[in-house]
Amino acid sequence: MTLNYLLYFCTPAKISIIFKYEHITPKKWMRLVKPKKALGQHFLKDLQIAERIADTLSDYKQLPVLEIGPGMGVLTQFLLEKGHDLTVVELDIESVDYLEQNFPVLEGKILAEDFLRLDLGKLFPDQFCVIGNYPYNISSQIFFKVLDYKEHIPCCSGMIQKEVAERLAAGPGSRHTAS
């Protein structure tokens, strides 16, 4: 049975097990996996961009970090390499399975939940940072939730879709303002 045949019939979580035997990198795996539009997924594949995003937290190493939507852990790996105390929240169970198998250092810190329903005050009673490659369909809601906790979140960093950035930065009466 060829690898292509196996990949066709396996879930993404099962595919990650094949990595060990077939030497498939996460980047190659992401080419095989289709992002789920219903979850607003878009996988971060560019390692240089991921590292630049992780570098935005260099002044906050003493604070815990919450990564939203880690997917296959491209940004996660840089945050861990830089020594951050990291917790991740991921709604997609296949991505959760992948993270659990490939990032054992995150045991107990992978939350298989919806970020928008998390009680951030309970999870982080003190200050913490938020970072991510934000799902496009809830980017605005993520920022509104972060604003609700602004006393606890000194830094929120990440990548968003250009159109979302234009809406968030638009002044009153601008053509980019959300209706």
What are these regions (language model features)?
Residues K14-S179:
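Catalytic cores of RNA-modifying enzymes
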Residues L6-L7:
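Intrinsically disordered, low-complexity segments enriched in serine/proline and basic residues
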